[in-house]
């Protein structure tokens, strides 16, 4: 058998006379080598991350902030260089690229007087394509505008930029598997994106991996209370509805928005206690609770709110006639807790999913609403320039 293919890492050469068995053996060897190299890559990444962490730890014997910073300096420089590239491209090249304009059917393009990149993370940049398109008389959709620029000019410019960057630092242009060592892949298009802080955002996705979405059809949330498992599912849904409301209104009418929030509060105050109580796992109950009986509660300094709430529940259960119906709360158990209006304690808990209605303390719906819904909401709206809503503003008008 004459081998007709060329493999960069194979010991077999094109035109070499080999048997089928030799080819299968070589394939097996290359698969083992690929697996080994993949493991080495992962180990190296973990090692570098560990080195960065330990060298930046002030109690480490070889602590050195400058060396720690140098570990991540290259990746930091790459993202800064990428931001600079996109800003220059859209401010200098795109407005004056007549050939590109002709291909895209653009006859008018005003100067781009803002930075094209409005957010960058460790390995990604977000570009203001909608604002850029509005500077032109492009006739197509936003998605078509993005793809037209990429296919007709930008993709090649990005590739050349990365090749030049690697050459400047004398790096490898290809990885061991033959792929480019550095590439910038197009990920998604969004109708709009809302950031509250770094790595905390809401994306209203328009296109991703070849699939188009209508507004609000695919909303991705990262780092916010909507995604936290400790936030009750019912409350997460209320927050999700409000986020959709915000994404639908580019300019919020404060009066209408307050009416919407009041409606959400009405739903909240009509919910059962298990739907608005916070879920947490109890750790260190026996360590922090010294006394919890006969209305006397004594704790070790540093006790958490969920342990305090659990101790009140245990005390009430102990003196009730329902000791055989409900469990005592112990370390390791998952519980739900909430703020209470009862003068005996401002917090109360129960075993997760098993509310003890016979001796539940009354819930402080107003405080619970403020903590679970209003506080997370204010973090979102203040990030878009809307003043935080005080609790008093959401209070219902008296009926008499």
Where are these regions (language model features)?
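Function-dense linear segments that define catalytic or interfacial modules
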Residues: 47, 51-54
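Gly-rich Lys/Arg/Thr-decorated short loops/hinges at beta-loop-alpha junctions or inter-strand turns
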Residues: 56-70
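DNA-dependent DNA polymerase catalytic subunits
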Residues: 1-47, 64, 72-122, 129-400
């Amino acid at each position: 058998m004459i081998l007709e293919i060329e493999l960069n890492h194979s010991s077999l050469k094109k035109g070499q006379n080999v048997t089928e068995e030799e080819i299968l053996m070589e394939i097996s060897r290359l698969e083992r080598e690929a697996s080994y190299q993949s493991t080495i890559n992962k180990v190296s990444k973990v090692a570098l991350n560990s080195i960065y962490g330990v060298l930046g730890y002030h109690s480490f014997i070889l602590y050195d902030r400058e060396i720690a910073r140098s570990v991540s300096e290259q990746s930091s420089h790459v993202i800064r260089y990428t931001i600079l590239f996109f800003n220059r491209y859209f401010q200098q090249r795109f407005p004056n690229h007549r050939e590109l304009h002709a291909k895209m059917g653009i006859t008018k393009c005003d100067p781009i007087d803002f930075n094209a990149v409005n957010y960058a993370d460790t390995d990604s940049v977000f570009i203001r394509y909608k604002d850029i398109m509005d500077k032109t008389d492009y006739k197509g959709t936003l998605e078509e505008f993005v793809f037209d620029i990429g296919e007709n000019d930008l993709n090649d410019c990005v590739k050349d930029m990365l090749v030049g960057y690697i050459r400047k630092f004398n790096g490898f242009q290809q990885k061991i598997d033959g792929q480019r060592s550095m590439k910038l892949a197009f990920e998604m298009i969004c109708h709009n994106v809302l950031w509250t802080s770094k790595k905390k955002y809401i994306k209203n996705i328009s296109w991703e991996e070849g699939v188009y979405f209508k507004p609000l059809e695919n909303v991705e949330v990262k780092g916010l209370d909507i995604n936290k498992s400790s936030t009750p599912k019912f409350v997460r849904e209320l927050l999700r509805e409000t986020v959709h409301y915000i994404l639908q209104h580019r300019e919020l009418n404060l009066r209408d928005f307050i009416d919407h929030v009041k409606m959400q509060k009405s739903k909240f105050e009509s919910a059962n206690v298990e739907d608005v109580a916070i879920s947490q796992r109890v750790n260190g109950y026996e360590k922090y609770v010294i006394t919890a009986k006969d209305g006397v509660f004594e704790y070790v300094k540093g006790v958490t709110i969920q342990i305090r709430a659990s101790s009140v529940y245990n005390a009430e259960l102990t003196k009730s006639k329902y000791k055989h119906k409900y469990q005592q709360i112990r370390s390791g158990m998952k519980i739900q807790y909430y703020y209470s209006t009862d003068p005996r304690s401002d917090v109360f808990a129960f075993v997760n999913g098993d509310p003890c209605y016979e001796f539940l303390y009354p819930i402080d719906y107003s405080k619970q609403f403020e903590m679970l819904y209003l506080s997370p909401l204010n973090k979102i709206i203040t990030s878009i320039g809307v003043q935080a809503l005080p609790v008093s503003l959401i209070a219902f008008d008296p009926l008499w």
